[in-house]
Amino acid sequence: MNKESLKEYLSSRYQGWNSFLSNVIFPIFGENDFEDGFETELLESQPERRQLAEATGIRSIKQVGMMYVGVEPLQIFDVTVSDRVMMERNRVNIQRLIRAVMDQFSCAFMLFHYEDDTRWDWRFTYCRKSGNKEETTDSKRYTFLLGPGQSCRTATDNFMALYDKRDSLEIKDIEDAFNVEALSKEFFGKYKAQYEAFVNYMVDPANGMRQDFIDTDFDHTGMKADKIRDREEKPIRDYVKKLLGRIVFLHFLQKKGWLGVPAGKEWGEGDRDFMLNIFKNATERQKENFLDDILEDLFEEGLDRNRSDRGDLYDTKVEGFRNCRIPYLNGGLFERDNLDKKPSHFPASYFDGLLTMLSQYNFTIDENDPNDAEVGVDPEMLGRIFENLLEDNKDKGAFYTPKEIVQYMCRESLIAYLQTDQREEDKNCIRQFVTTHDAALLGDLKEDIDQKLCDVKICDPAIGSGAFPMGLLRELFFCRSAIEPNIVENAANIKRHIIQNNIYGVDIERGAVDIARLRFWLSLIVDEKSPEALPNLDFKIMQGNSLLEQYKGADLSTMTEKKVGAGQGVTIFDSMLDVYRKNLRDKLAEYYACPEHDKKAQLRKDIADIVKQELDEQGIRIDFEDMDLSANSQFFLWHTWFHDVFSRPSKEGFDIVIGNPPYGAKYDNQTKRYYKNTYVTANSIRGLQKGSLDTYTLFIELGYNLLRRNGSFAYIVPISLTSSDSLTGIHRIIMGNCDTIHISSYAVRPKPVFENAVVNTSILLFKKTETPCQHLFSTKMHRRGNEFELQRLIDNLNFVDVNGYTMIGRIPKIGSEMEKDILTKIFKNTLVSTKKS
C-alpha cells in the first residue's frame, strides 16, 4: 500500500465496495479471515427498518462481508443513499438504523455513498455497538468524509498507520485511528503556532504595526513593565483572533460550495478550496498585501454587503474569481471596526503557511457529539481552540468542558424541565425520549412536550465559547425533529426559532461572545440549501459582567419595575412603563432579523436611547460616557435585555440555568463590597455560615436567583462545593430550597478525569422547588484509571442518598449502599460517644 496512491484513491469518486475491499481493506486486514456476505439486503425482510431507512434517505443496506480483528467480529456494510440532504440532516435516525442492523456487541465498517450523483462525497464509517439492545445508547459512530473536494490527508495517514500494524491489529488500533481528540490536539498545535506567528509579527516594532494597534489608555499605576506591555498588546491579540476566526469560518463556508460560485451557477457549485486557490491565483503583488488588498475587501464588500440585485456577484480582483458569487451573510461577523480600518501588512509567506495548513484538514459544519463524530475540524473544536486562547483563562479558573459532560448536563437539565408537572408514571418515558429521540414513547404527551420544548428559556451566565447553549440547541433540535413533521424542510427554521426564543448567554470576554455567536451561525448554515441572511445575535449572546447589575453604586436591576408608595412592597407596571417595555421588546425583535446596515445602526441607537431614557426616569443619574450599555465588561442589565424572560406570568426567570463558571478570580475592594451587599453567600453570619467570595459560589447564587420556581440548574464547579466551611452559605440556599439535589465528583489525580482541569470538580444538579431538601444524591470520587472512557463513566454514575449525613460545609462522597451503612455506623458511634462525654 502506497501513501500517495491511497490518498489519490480516497480523493476519487466512489468506485464500489469491491474496489474498496481490494484497495483498502484487504491490504490492511488480509483476505484469509474474510467471510463473504453475498450482498445480503437487510431492509427487505424488516419492514420497520425499511420505513426508518426511507425516512432517513437510505435506499439499501447490504452486508458484503465479515472478518475478525483478533477475536472480535467486524461486519462490512454497503449503504446506498437516495437523498444527500436527508442523510446530512437525519443523524439521529441514522444512529437508530445502525443500532438496529448491527449484531449485539459488534463493530462494523460502513460505506455510505449516493446513487444519484457521484460528484458528491462518500463516507467511510466505523461503528461500535457495545449494548445488546437495538435502542441502546451505548454505540458510537466515527466517519471520514472522502471523495473529490475533500481533504483526505488525515484518513490517508490513519489508514497507513493501520497498515503498518497489519500483522498485530486489534480493535483498539482501529478506534485510535478514528480518534477525534488526537486530531483536535494536532490541529490546535498548528493553529496556535500560526496565531503566535501573526501576533509576534505585529508586536515587533520593526514591522511598523505595533504603535497603530496597541492601547495605552489605561491606568499604569503599580504595574510592572512586562504587565504594561502585555496590556498594551491585548488589542493585537484580539485582532489576530478575530482575523483567524473569520478565515476559519470561511473554510467551513466553502465546504458548502458557497464561495467563488461561477456567474449563472447555483449555490453549492462553488470552489471547495476557494481560500487557498484565491491566494494561489493572486499576483505576487497581491500576495504581499493579501489582507488589505484582497481579504479586507472580500469581508466588507463581499460578505457584508447585500448584492442580491446583482445576482450576488463580486469581483475579488484575483484572476479566476473576477466575477463570482459570494453570499451576503449579515450577522456582524464581517463588519469593520476601528482596528480593521488600520493598515496592516504581512509577508506573503504568512498567509501561504496559514492557508496551506488549513487546507490539509476536513472542515465539517455539523458539530460532533460523543457518539457520532466526523473525523475533522468541527465548530466545537473551534470553540475549544478559541477558549484555550482567551485572555487569562487559567487565572480565571476556566477550563473547557468535555463534550460528554456537556451532553450529560444538557440532557439532565432538559429532562428535569420536561418532567416538571408530569405524572410519576410518565417521567421515565420522557427520560427515554430525550436520550433516544423516539417520539412513540411519549404517546399522548407528544403535543404537550413539543410545546414545552418551544417555550423553554435557557441561560448560560458564563457562556465561554458556547458549549452548553450549543449542546442544548442540539438536544432541543433533535427532540423537536422527532416530534414535528417535515424535518428536512423545516430544520433551519426550527434552529432559528430555538436561537431566537430559547437561548440566552452572557460572558465578560468579548472574544468568547464572538466565537459563541459564530458557532450558532454555523449551526444554521449546515441546514440551509442556499445562503440566508444570518440573525443578529447582539442581544441574545451578549458581553457583560454577569455578577454586576450596578454601576458606580447605582442599582440597575429595577429599571423595569416601579414601586407604589413607600414601604408598600407592591410592584406594578404603569402605562408609561408598559410603553417602555413594549418599545424595547419590539425594537429588539426587529433588530434580530434586520439585514440592512443603516437600519441596524438606527435600531441600536433607538434601543440605547430607550434604555437611557428609562434610566433617567428612574432617577439614575449616571454619565455612561461612551460606554455601550449592551456590550461592556463592567455590568450586565439582566432585567432589561432579557426582560421577556423575567416578565412571564407565574414563570419569572429562566427554566434552565447551565454552565461552567470561572473560579478563583481576584477583585478590587470596591467590587468585594458590592458582592457582599448583593450576594447572601458572600457574607459570614455568626452561627450560620462562613461567607465565600469565590467566583463560582457567586455564580451559583446568581444562577439560583435567575431561575424561576421549579427551574433546573446544572453547573460544573470545583469540588470545594462538597468540602469547605466557606460553602455553608451555598448549602443553606440549596438545602433549604431544592427538593432533590445530585452531586457527582471527579478527581484530577492520578490523571484528570476532565482533561485540562487543574482542580477536582463536581457536577451540581438541582431543581428550585423552594421547599426543603428531601434527597441529596452523591457519588464517590471518580478517578481516571486504565482503559478509562469518560462516556462509559457518565453512563454508569451511581448515586446514593446522603441526606442527613452532611456536616458543616461537608457532603459525603460515597458510591454504594454498603458505604452508606458504614457511614451510618460511624454517625451512630460518634453520637453515642458524644452523649457519654
Where are each of the predicted segments found?
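Flexible, glycine-/basic-rich loop-and-beta segments that form/coincide
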Residues: 755-834
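Short, surface-exposed amphipathic charged segments that create phosphate/polyanion-binding patches used
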Residues: 552-560, 754-763
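P-loop NTPase motor core
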Residues: 499-503, 511, 533, 537-560
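Conserved SAM-binding loop
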Residues: 516
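SAM-dependent methyltransferase catalytic-core segment centered on the flexible catalytic loop
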Residues: 458, 467-494, 549-593, 606-609, ...
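Adenylate-forming
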Residues: 702, 746-750, 780-782
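Preference for the N-terminal adenyl/adenosyl cofactor-binding alpha/beta module
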Residues: 2-99, 106-471, 475-477, 506-511, ...
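Short mixed-charge
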Residues: 422-449, 481-496, 525-535
